[in-house]
Amino acid sequence: MKNIAKYMMGAAMMCAATGVSAQALNSGYFLDGYLFKHQLNPALESDKSYFSIPVLGNMNFGTMGNVGLANFIYPTAGNKLTTFMNRSVSADEFLGGLRNINKMSMNLNTSIISMGFRGWGGFNTLDIGLRSSSSIYVPKDFFEFMKVGQSGPNTVYDLGSMGISTSNYVEIALGHSRRIFDNLRVGAKFKVLLGGLYANMNLSNTKITLSEEKWEVMANGEMNIAMAGLNVPTKEESGAEYTGNEGTLVDFDNIEMDSPGLGGFGLALDLGATYQVMDNLTVSAAIKDLGFMSWSNNTYASTNNEPWTFDGFEDLSMNEDDGNSLDDQLDALTDDFEDYTNLHRRSTGGKLSRALAATLNLGAEYALPMYDKLSFGFLSSTRINGKYSWSEGRFSANVSPLSWFEAGINYGVTSYGSTMGWIVNFHPRVLSLFVGMDYIVGKVSKQYIPLNNMNMNLSFGLNVTF
């Protein structure tokens, strides 16, 4: 379980984030042959019936952020890597590349089984898939505190709030769309959600006072973590060393998994419609994921309503002789962050209900009268998720020169900056293959992690059509 905390800390360093929608490829919204556009708007139907090749039918992985890996991980001598906390990285160099609020999200949408067919007066869909979304947001001042610390006899940091959240579940969705009038089509999708893991931590109203005598933190912090079979002990229960009232602190090092199982249950609804204004102009709208998830075996922890002392984050060095690898540095940063949060366990084994993050999609498409195989579209997507909310507007050009081939290219403006996307879709008889990206990745690391910002998306699928 220590590794989970370490990877979450690593994600926090790669940016600090907000939510991204676990949905289909936005670039395919206006393509008739794109089989999964019903995941963007339940009123949309593809031009063929289909069933997916298990797991390979629709794979969609993406990250979004206004910073990148290169803001937090730096090269050193000997072809090694180190974090921004290394004294070889200057504060000006590190802080100069950050935003006032640094955000990142990582998302996975995988269709295990999916099918669509005509019947009962309309188009019907069945989806069983994995949905995973993790988000972080961190103010720049927090990283300044980590890197610089005390810069005079008395230093005060007013950090505001920061948070990290992850939600993971299996979704079973049944959809139906039909034409009501010649120019109006409506659709709905009913979803049953089976919970895996939910975790959320938030620190608000944070004030850090640094003096020659002591470093003191005051914040309102809360944490919920829910997963079947997960045991979250206190330091007193695990036998860890502590002093004073520290016995009720969460012992992150000794979190254990006993017997995994169903971690929660939820329901959700998608609603959508399309309306043909005139022969060559169609508008559409959809609201997705109106619903809730009820989690079981939830552990709740919070800070005390009083300040606590903190020794600060280590100024990590990397010498060839000390074996201080990047992995070791992330471990050390994780330990420091756990001490910083100062979360006392209040309850365990409880219930927790949370509304889902909803997504609003609005679209308009105009086909050229003289060549209706070429169309231009605009799609607006807004993720409604509190501090993790985001929005984007995307202009696209789409062409279907052949009955079995279509493609699109688009330009978008998002909460994280501008981006370009594309999709190609081959759908001859029997088979359908699509590949696309909503965010064209720039420079990447050897592990294919975006360096300059976290905006990256890849979607592909192989399906059988009939």
Residue ranges of model-derived segments:
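Subset of outer-membrane beta-barrel
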Residues: Q23-F466
